[in-house]
């Protein structure tokens, strides 16, 4: 099956210009199904929140590889924009404004990011004589809240249209 033109490749997936104003994020072969489902469910949980983001439409299976269909967002990455313009201050302003708009939307129906971090810490120490105890204790001391944590917020993951 033709997935369309490749428009990006990352650590976990390749993104294709799919059809009808949508892109396909096709996860690399062997990427865990539960991780794909978690990404889809987390994205769907954002549907009613007031900040710009692509909408997810569903999980697809293409020749044994799982993918998620998203809205196609046109624009350039903030990384490319800042390299083109040299406007570091403008980049910081765009990122701060977007980050504020994300934080202005409390969210309650997604998994705890603290629990996610603790789980990853435990996995990273598996088979080691060291223990993640100190770090997990610090995480436990952080307050719980309803703020959304993107987890991968950087200029390469932000698309802009003519400087906005």
Regions found by a protein language model. Give the residues of each.
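Conserved N-terminal boundary motif of the eukaryotic protein kinase catalytic domain
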Residues: 1-5
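ATP-binding glycine-rich loop module of kinase domains
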Residues: 9-36
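Residues forming the ATP-binding cleft of Hanks-type serine/threonine protein kinase domains
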Residues: 27, 60, 73
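The N-lobe alphaC helix and its flanking beta3-alphaC-beta4 segment of protein kinase-like domains
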Residues: 33-49
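Short beta-strand micro-motifs within the conserved protein kinase catalytic domain, predominantly
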Residues: 55-66
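Conserved short submotifs of the Hanks-type protein kinase catalytic core
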Residues: 64-77
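Conserved kinase catalytic-core helix
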Residues: 79-113, 132, 138
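An alpha-helical support segment within catalytic cores of ATP-dependent transferases
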Residues: 104-151, 156, 161-162
């Amino acid at each position: 099956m033709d997935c369309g033109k490749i428009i990006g490749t990352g650590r976990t997936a390749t993104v294709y210009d799919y059809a009808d104003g949508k892109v396909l994020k096709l996860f690399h072969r062997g990427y865990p199904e539960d991780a794909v489902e978690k990404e889809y469910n987390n994205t769907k949980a954002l549907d009613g929140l007031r900040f710009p983001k692509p909408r997810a439409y569903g999980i697809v299976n293409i020749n044994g590889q799982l993918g998620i269909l998203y809205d196609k967002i046109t624009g350039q990455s903030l990384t490319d924009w800042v390299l083109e313009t040299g406007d570091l201050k403008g980049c910081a302003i765009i990122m701060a404004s977007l980050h504020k708009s994300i934080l202005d939307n409390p969210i309650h129906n997604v998994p705890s990011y603290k629990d996610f971090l603790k789980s990853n810490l435990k996995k990273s120490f598996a088979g080691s004589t060291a223990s993640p105890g100190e770090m997990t204790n610090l995480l436990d001391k952080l307050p719980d809240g309803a703020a959304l944590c993107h987890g991968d917020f950087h200029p390469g993951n932000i698309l802009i249209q003519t400087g906005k």
